[in-house]
Amino acid sequence: MPVGFDTSAASSAPASTPAADAPRVSPRSSQRTAVAARRARASRRHPDPWRDADAQTNVDEMARSLEARGRTPAQARLRRRFLKFVPVGSGARVLEVGCGTGVVVRDLAALVGRRGKVVGIDASRRLLDRARALCRETARRTPIALRVADAASLPFAADRFDAALAITVILHVADPLRVVREMARVTRPGGRVGVQDQDFGVVAVTHPDRALTERIMRGVAERVYVEPHSGRRLPGLLRAAGLVDVRLLTDVYQDTTLEPWTKTFLERRAERAVRFGIVDVSTAERWLDGFTEVVAADAFVLTLNYYGAVGTKSA
């Protein structure tokens, strides 16, 4: 039976909803070693599903998870703050790498307006099909183009965009330096390259069994993401790609009530921990029951750090 929160008992936890869930500057040999390590993680028996979404049997659920996360107020605040930090203004031509279902594309369209243009690329045709449907109304007000493309070999001329962004993408990439260099190539001199990622080495959550929580959270992150600690590496990554005036924005997703997106995030951690052999089913269910107890005591807290780095392409 699927691992999930026990909703039969009275609890203050909300009902389940259909939702989801860089190297530093170093000698060239060290960079090659880092890339090789990320590629090895990417080819493990339990690969990152987002690297090849179209090959997954649950891509529709993945699409719903992106939209559910996008609707979460705390996540929307994180995006708005990062886009303001870049910044993105009226009339800008902006590229989003790894646009998924177009959550950020729609945010960008509202910022650039009729005189601007937003281009979104993704490796997944199926996610882009969903994005086209969801962006149809927005595209009547702002020029939007969506296309299948490889982030490591962008199909655009040099100096084409005012800004190129990748939001919660780099942690899924085996060679992030190559991707950021491509983003810089297609950005005009004086334009901005911005990347934002979670860092799964900095997750705090209240639970009666801290050791078990650490084992599950760390074990799943190391098996699912190519680079689970991507967030802390972003400033060095931009500098290694030749960008200047690199700035760092730190932010935190926080939840004190076990919101639907957080609930599903934890359920997925439990399910994957079982699938990867980190814990058995009964242990995973006991772990989730612990959160129900914490919520009932009005003591639940989950925080996940986000890091955003923005650099300028020199003339």
Indicate where each model-derived feature is located.
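Class I SAM-dependent methyltransferase SAM/SAH-binding core
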Residues: 95-97, 101-153
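N-terminal, positively charged/glycine-rich alpha-helical extensions of SAM-dependent methyltransferases
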Residues: 2-9, 24-64
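A short glycine-rich, Lys/Arg-flanked "PGG" loop and its adjoining helix->strand segment in the class I
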Residues: 177-192
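Conserved alpha-helix/loop element of class I SAM-dependent methyltransferases that forms part
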Residues: 73-90, 107
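A short SAM/SAH-binding and catalytic strip from SAM-dependent methyltransferases
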Residues: 162-175
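Conserved Class I S-adenosyl-L-methionine
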Residues: 247-315
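Conserved catalytic/acceptor-binding region of the Class I
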Residues: 192-259
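A short acidic, Gly/Pro-enriched loop at the edge of an enzyme's catalytic core
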Residues: 152-163
